[in-house]
Amino acid sequence: MISFIVCLLLLITGYLTYGKIVDKTFGPDDRETPAVRINDGVDYVVMPQWKLFLVQLLNIAGLGPIFGALQGALWGPVVFLWITFGTIFAGGVHDYFSGMISERNDGASIAEVTGKYLGHTMQNIMRVFSVVLLIMVGTVFAVGPAGLIVTLCKSNGVSGVLSTTLFWLILILVYYFIATFISIDKIIGKVYPLFGMCLIIMAVGVIIGIFTNPNYTIPEIWSHLYNMHPSGTPVWSFMFITVACGAISGFHSTQSPLMARCMKNEKQGHFVFYGAMVAEGIIALIWAAAGCALYEVTGGLNTGLAEALAGGQSAAIYDVCSKTMGGVGIALAMIGVVICPITSGDTAFRSARLTLSDWFHMDQSSYANRLKLCIPVLGIGAILGIGNATGLIDYTVIWRYFSWTNQTLAMIVLWAAAMYLFTEKKNFWMAAVPATFMSAVSCTYFILAPECLGSLLNSKTADGTVIYNTAVAYPIGIVFAALLLALFIRATKKRSAKKSA
C-alpha cells in the first residue's frame, strides 16, 4: 500500500512541478485564442475551464485507463512505476504539446500540426493514419456498447427488437451522427462533464473500498520486482503498450485539438491538457491497484486476475465495482462500461470530421460542408459496425493492430513536439527523450507481438507457451530509437544551417 500512496503523491507532485515546467517552457501568453478569434459557433466555442478539463478527461479516457490498467496489473505492482513516470514525463508532455501547439495553429488537427514540423510526407501519412484510426475507434466504441446493452437486456428478461445488437448499434450510430454534426457545446459541453465526474467517482469509490476492507492489500513494488504475468509475457515492451491511456496514448493527440478550439486563454492549458492526463494516470493507478489487490496470486503469478479478465473486460470491471462498492458500484459499473466508450466514440468521429475538414480546407460553419463529411465518415462506420454485427464483415484483423498504431502515433507526435520546441529555441529534450523512449517501445513491440512480426520470430514449447525472441527484438528496438534520435539531431542541424545561411 505504501507503493501506491507514494506513486499517487508523485503524480500530484508531478502535475504541480514538472507540469509547470512544461507549461513555462511552452510559454502561454495573453494572445487571442482560436475560440475567441474564430468562434464559428460549431467547433470554435468558448467553454469554461472546468468543463474543458472534464470533457478532455472523458474524451481521452473512456474506459482506456480502466481496461489498460487491469490488463497491466497482470505484470504486478511494477505497473505502478510505468503509470506514474510515464504519465509525468511522457503522457503529460504528449497531451500538453499536442493541445497547445494545435491552439497556436488555429486549433489544427494533429495531422496538420505534425506535417508543419515533420514535413509534407509525414503530414499525408498522418492524415490517412488518423482518419483510419478514428473511424476504427468510433466503430468499436459503437459495437461494444451495443453488445453490452443487449447482454443487460437479455439478463433482465427483455426480448424482441430491444434484445438485438443491430437495433442498439443503429441507435448509437444515429446519436454519433448528431453529436458529430452539431455544435460542440450542445451535447458534449453540457452532458460530458457529468460523465467525467462519474468516471472520477467510480475510481474514488474503488480505492475507498480497498482501503476500508481488511481483506484487500495492495502489494508493494519492492516485494514483487519480477514478472507476475501468468503467460510470462515480457514486461518490455508489452506492459508499456498494454497500459496505453493510463500512461501515454497517441489517441489523445487526436482529441486535444477539440478542446484547443474551446479555450478562452492559453494559460488554461496546464490544467486542461497536462492536468487531465495526470487525472487519467491517477484513475489508472487506482484500477491497477485494484487488479493487484482483489485477486488471488498463485505461485507468484496473477492467476486470479487473469481468470477474471478471461471472462471479458467489462465483466472484470463489474466484479471490481461490486467487490469494492456493492450495489452502488454495480450501478456505476453499468454506466461506465456503456456510457464511457460511447463518449469516446462520438468524439472520435468528430475528430475524423475535423481532420478531413483541415485536410480539404472545408469551412465547418456551413451545414452543407459538415454533411459532406459526416455522411461518409459515419457511413463507413455504419458499414463496418453493421457488417460486423451481422457477421458479414470481420474488422477485428485491423483492430488487432490498434495497440501498436496507437503508441506509434504517440511517438510521432512527440517527435513533432520536439521539432516545434527546437524551432522555438526551447528545451526540445523535454519531448525528444520520451519520443526516443516510445520509439524503442513501439519498435520492440512490433517485432515481438504475435499480430505483427512475432508470429515469424517467436517460437512455442510443446504445451503452447510462447518463447519471445527478445534477443533479437531488444537490440533492434534500441538501435531503431537511437537512429531516430540521430535523424532528429541531424534535421535540427540542417535547420540551423539554413537559418544562418
Identify the role of each PLM range.
Residues 47-64, 207-215, 224-287, 332-344:
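Hydrophobic, membrane-embedded alpha-helices of multi-pass small-molecule transporters
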Residues 10-66, 265-268:
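Membrane-interface "cap" regions at the ends of multi-pass membrane proteins
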Residues 2-19, 72-102, 111, 329-330, ...:
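Extracellular loop-to-transmembrane helix junctions
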Residues 123-127, 162-170, 275-285, 292, ...:
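Loop-to-transmembrane helix boundary motifs in multi-pass membrane proteins
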Residues 99, 209-221, 275-319, 386-393:
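Extracellular/periplasmic helix-exit of transmembrane alpha-helices
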